[in-house]
Amino acid sequence: MNEKDLKALVEQLVGQMVGELDTNVVSETVKKATEVVVDNNACIDDITEVDIRKQLLVKNPKDAEAYLDMKAKTPARLGIGRAGTRYKTETVLRFRADHAAAQDAVFSYVDEEFIKENNMFAVETLCKDKDEYLTRPDLGRKFSPETINNIKSKFGTNQKVLILVGDGLSSAAIEANLKDCVPAIKQGLKMYGIDSSEILFVKHCRVGAMDHLGEELGCEVICMLVGERPGLVTAESMSAYIAYKPYIGMAEAKRTVISNIHKGGTTAVEAGAHIAELIKTMLDKKASGIDLK
């Protein structure tokens, strides 16, 4: 028996053991299994939209109700579970997505259309770009003489209240909160009989920029709304720094601060009403910061 006959015999025996297979059926099955299905209307869920306060990834928790009750009180990453000794894929992806959002908030700019829509007069500090803004904080507190003159011609001097918006370290915070916060401030001031001018927008802005403006313009109260350094909890946190007659070299303790203005903290509308009340108090007591106590 030669090799060819041996091969034929083996094929015959195998065929008898497993049954003859229809090659056409096999081909069709393989084709269906490997066929690519494309759904043009489908999309991947945005992982950052998941409320981690309501998400429990621990497998078979002893007391899930108590765990969720604890998570509801903090945005901390609790109950994220493990795959062996490692984080789960969903946990890692959410961490990276939140980190990316924080980076984007720092390195992006407030949209020019947004500035126009909110009727803000835009200027910028001495910083030329974002890199210089991050590495030279001192330049983010100063304005050129030309810029100061432009501001004076637009807003005048010796104003009672100046509302200032600075991009700070989070452009996302400004775009997310300003439309609700500013109207609440203006409405509150109007109730107290206090006039507020147009809004000044400052690009590459540090908190100390209000000191330079206070000294040059002679405003009684300056309220600065500025994007705060983003973190993994949120990239949309805004703060309000308010000072009575700010000047260059003013101690930080003389500023009154309302922080964590975002949808997961103090809401923009609530913060706006509180800011208006604080401005009224500062004008009455002619003080701010710890001097207001």
From Swiss-Prot:
Protein name: Ethanolamine ammonia-lyase small subunit
Reactions listed under catalytic activity: ethanolamine = acetaldehyde + NH4(+)
Cofactor(s) this protein cannot do without: adenosylcob(III)alamin
A Pfam family per the record: EutC
Cofactor note: Binds between the large and small subunits.
Compartment(s) where it occurs, according to its Swiss-Prot or TrEMBL record: Bacterial microcompartment
Enzyme class: lyase
Species: Clostridioides difficile (strain 630) (Peptoclostridium difficile)
